[in-house]
């Protein structure tokens, strides 16, 4: 953390196809090894599959999907005396979105479909319908925060 001044947030430009910042950010999360065009191809293909299967606008489905997995609470470790407590804290708005995207991509990659496009499309559709591993991750995070509610007074 810098001591002098607050670091300015980088502005992410909207993607060329959908003209949307959320899609551009998700492309950056999917990207591995600087291969942005490959990540774009995978996401655009997945959004195409999603729009065909749902009959709705792909970006709207994606945003609803991300809303379904945004966590509101998480736990952070806090050392008090000799023991470490898992203290529940609220998640900042920007972190909610980034966690949701990371979880979506992580659990999409863990799926058994053949291509990345199919994996992403499958996970987006599952999360849209409140199923899938990413939804389970959000529920587990909330459950963990609820279980450690007794330590909420250690918040900083």
Swiss-Prot record:
GO terms for biological process: translation. It comes from the Bacteria. GO terms for cellular component: small ribosomal subunit. One of its GO terms (molecular function) is rRNA binding. Pfam families: Ribosomal_S7. Keywords: Ribonucleoprotein, Ribosomal protein, RNA-binding, rRNA-binding, tRNA-binding. NCBIfam families: rpsG_bact. One of the primary rRNA binding proteins, it binds directly to 16S rRNA where it nucleates assembly of the head domain of the 30S subunit. Is located at the subunit interface close to the decoding center, probably blocks exit of the E-site tRNA. Belongs to the universal ribosomal protein uS7 family. Part of the 30S ribosomal subunit. Contacts proteins S9 and S11. HAMAP family: Ribosomal_uS7_B (MF_00480_B). PANTHER family: RIBOSOMAL PROTEIN S7 (PTHR11205). This is Small ribosomal subunit protein uS7.
